[in-house]
């Protein structure tokens, strides 16, 4: 697969202003923001492709999304998220998804979510007229918590200044649904996409869910060319801004001296660069980890460099579920069959068992939005199954794979009879596969759970106990998902850029900018709401 960015083909410079470890969307956006302000940036990725979960792979002429295929807001230029991509020079094309999602229920009925909010509300009220008043009240609360949540989690407004958020702050999705509704099927319908959070509704924040729920209606998109096209273009823009990218290169440790991050020790794993440079220490003013937080603190930093007891609160945090994926290349299956079959398949109304037996799987056909992902006239189907599992309790991953695949293909035949005879290419990815290619703890989908107690101050901050060491992405604030990790990148970029200005004023040349007579523009965290929040000038 030819990539548009070049990547370093020579040894890296001995020193950079910033080293970013990991090229998920958080790392890619952050590197772009820093490079845009003139910082010399090195982005390091252990895989041979960039993107993390937002990447693709090819098998037999089919291009499969490794994981992510759901991109709220990014294709809408009227949202601040979409506008940010434009400011960074990203020209990726986006296909709007309508319906947004489809839910298949145990009684055989289905509900397709329209892309327009008014149409969605009208459809809900038509199917549940006895709950019409409750729906109005519920979505009034959703809208309010959405805006207040943006101020709190994305803009950093303290909870004490947002009195109207207090009644909702500790509320879970399940508690909210039980408060407003009686019909168990309507409750499931309103939480039927909860697998995208990687946790059951009883452990998912109502506020954070509200923020995503309403963002659907500002546009939910699939990238032209697939996820890799988006990630690769972000990498290309980094290089155009003067940044460097090292793929197939593992960060072995973060160099800590006198309590400060001073660089990273790197090892080239494969590729032609290894003949000229096997690895070594690259010095930097700041280091940012876009990787797994436990791996960062336990292995790259080391407990000896952390304050006593610093690791225990992190080890107690709950990670999101892993997601099993089966990627299928199909021949001779009409697009209309897949269009009808797409969506979440629920076998029980008990949504708390989402990672066990309540949710059969989700089906998604990317070729309905981007036909070029498959050979002409052929199709791709991705089967996703969220799994609540004991990762370390699996002693035979091959047997685990056989059992899950047997379940998936037996049930897939129930949905689309005869489909197994049309499979040309078949590939499956377990939690262990996700860990292998991304190094995410136990193959977690979205970092830590987005439960009320693991958001805000309950979630690790981007600044660490080590000076000049930051974290970005779904293992830190504000949370998991495409928009939150972009906000994370903006927040970290702002901290780094403001820190460099302060260092230049104090005469600390290790962090100071080369040009000290002007402050770079620290990016405002983006929001993508029904209402755009006014930008406030930072003093």
Locate predicted features:
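Rossmann-like flavin
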Residues: 106-204
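Extreme N-terminal leader/targeting segments of oxidoreductases
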Residues: 1-18, 36-37, 451-455, 463, ...
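Helical element adjacent to the flavin cofactor pocket in flavoenzyme catalytic cores
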Residues: 210-277
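C-terminal segments that line or cap access tunnels to active or ligand-binding sites in enzymes
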Residues: 331-433
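Short beta-strand to alpha-helix junction loop
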Residues: 78, 162-175, 215-237, 246-248, ...
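N-terminal glycine-rich phosphate/pyrophosphate-binding loop and immediately adjacent elements
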Residues: 3-141, 450
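Mid-domain catalytic core of redox enzymes
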Residues: 252-375, 513
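A glycine-rich dinucleotide-binding beta-alpha-beta segment and adjacent secondary-structure elements
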Residues: 183-197, 358-362, 418-478
């Amino acid at each position: 697969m030819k990539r548009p960015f070049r990547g370093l083909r020579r040894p890296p410079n001995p020193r950079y202003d910033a080293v970013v470890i990991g090229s998920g969307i958080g790392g890619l956006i952050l590197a772009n923001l820093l490079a845009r302000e003139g910082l010399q940036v090195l982005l390091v990725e252990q895989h041979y492709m960039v993107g993390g979960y937002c990447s693709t792979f090819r098998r037999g002429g089919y291009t499969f999304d490794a994981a992510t295929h759901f991109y709220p807001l990014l294709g809408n230029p009227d949202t601040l998220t979409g506008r940010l991509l434009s400011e960074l020079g990203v020209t990726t094309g986006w296909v709007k998804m309508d319906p947004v999602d489809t839910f298949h229920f145990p009684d055989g009925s289905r509900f397709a979510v329209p892309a327009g909010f008014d149409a969605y509300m009208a459809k809900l009220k038509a199917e549940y007229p006895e709950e019409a008043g409750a729906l109005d009240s519920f979505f009034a609360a959703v809208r309010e918590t959405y805006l207040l949540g943006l101020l709190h989690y994305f803009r950093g407004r303290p909870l004490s200044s947002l009195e109207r958020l207090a009644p909702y702050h500790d509320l879970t999705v399940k508690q909210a649904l039980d408060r407003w509704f009686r019909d168990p099927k309507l409750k499931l319908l309103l939480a039927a996409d909860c697998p995208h959070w990687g946790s059951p509704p009883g452990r998912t924040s109502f506020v954070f869910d509200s923020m995503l729920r309403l963002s659907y209606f500002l546009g939910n998109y699939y990238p032209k060319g697939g996820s890799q096209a988006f990630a690769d273009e972000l990498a290309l823009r980094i290089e155009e801004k003067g940044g460097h990218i090292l793929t197939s290169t593992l960060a072995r440790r973060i160099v800590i001296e006198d309590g400060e991050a001073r660089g990273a020790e790197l090892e080239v794993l494969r590729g032609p660069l290894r003949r000229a440079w096997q690895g070594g220490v690259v010095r930097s003013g700041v280091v940012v980890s876009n990787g797994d937080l436990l791996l960062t603190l336990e292995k790259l930093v080391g407990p000896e460099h952390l304050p006593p007891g610093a690791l225990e609160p992190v080890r107690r945090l709950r990670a999101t579920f892993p997601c099993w994926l089966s990627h299928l290349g199909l021949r001779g299956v009409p697009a209309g069959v897949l269009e009808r079959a797409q969506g979440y398949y629920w076998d029980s109304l008990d949504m708390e068992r989402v990672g066990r037996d309540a949710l059969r799987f989700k089906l998604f056909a990317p070729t309905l939005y981007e036909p070029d992902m498959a050979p002409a006239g052929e199709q791709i189907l991705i089967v996703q199954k969220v799994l609540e599992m004991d990762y370390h309790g699996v002693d035979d991953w091959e047997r685990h794979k056989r059992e899950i695949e047997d379940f998936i293909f037996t049930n897939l035949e129930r949905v689309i009879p005869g489909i197994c005879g049309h499979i040309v290419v078949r590939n499956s990815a377990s939690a262990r596969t996700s860990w292998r290619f991304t190094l995410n703890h136990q193959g977690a989908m979205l970092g830590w759970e987005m439960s009320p107690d693991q958001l805000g101050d309950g979630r690790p901050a981007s600044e660490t106990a080590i000076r000049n060491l930051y974290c970005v992405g779904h293992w830190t604030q504000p949370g998991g998902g495409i928009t939150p990790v972009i906000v994370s990148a903006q927040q970290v970029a702002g901290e780094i850029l403001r820190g460099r200005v302060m260092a230049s004023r104090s005469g600390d040349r290790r962090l100071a900018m080369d040009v000290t007579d002007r402050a770079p523009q620290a990016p405002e965290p983006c929001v993508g709401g029904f209402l755009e929040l006014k930008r406030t000038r930072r003093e």
